[in-house]
Amino acid sequence: MKYLCVYYQIIRKVFWNMKTFLFQGDSITDANRDDENNDNFGMGCGYAFLLASEFERNNKGKIKFINRGKSGDRITDVYARIKEDIINLKPDFMSILIGVNDVSHELTMNCGVSPEKFKKIYGMLIEEIRESLPEIKIIILEPFILKGSCTEKLWEEFNAEVRKLAEISKQVAEISDLDFVPLQDKFDKISSDGDTRYWSVDGIHPTSAGHQVIKEELHKVIENYI
C-alpha cells in the first residue's frame, strides 16, 4: 500500500502538476487516522482533517494532503521515519508539530529526549529533508501544554520543559528560515478562565475546539502558499 502511495505521488506530480502537503508529528497530528487508507479515513479527526477538508474543497486538482503523524512519537522517532514517511512522499509543503512526548516520556517513563538532543535532532531532520527536497516549504508548529489529567500532577515540570522545547522549535525555524506557528500563547489566552478542558481533553490532546484553533493558526501560513 505504501509503495503504491509513493508511486501515486510521482504520477501526480509528473502528469497532473498537483502539489502535496504533508502533516508530520505525534498523536495530536495523528488524531486516530487510519494508516491504511489515506484517501478516506487517513487524515484522522483533528486539525489535519479540518485543514485538508477546506483546502481540498476549494482547490480541486491543485493540492493533495497526506497525514503521517504517529501517536507517541518524539523528535527521534520522526527522524527515524524520515525516508519512508517524508522524503519518499516528495511533499512540496510540510508541517511538523512535535515535542510534547519528548517531555512526557521523560517525566513518566524516563525515555524522553533532552532539550539539547531535541535541538540537535530537529536541526538534522530539517537539514536532511532539504538536502533531498531542496524546494520544499517547511512549517514548524510550536508544541504546547495545558493543565489537565495527564499533566497536573507534574504540572510545573511539564510546563517548564515543554516551553523549553517550544523555544527551541522557534530557534530551529529561525536558523533554517522557516515559518513558525506559535500556539502556546494562543491556548493560554483562550483558556485564561481556567476551563482548559474545553480546549484539551487531558492537557496534551486537543478537543475538537482545540484542533480548530490549531487549524486556524496553521491556515494563516498555508494560505500564503496555496
Task: Put a short name on every predicted segment.
Residues 53-61, 77-226:
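Alpha-helical cap/lid subdomain in secreted, periplasmic
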Residues 70-75:
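Functional beta-strand-loop-alpha-helix junction segments that form "active/interaction loops"
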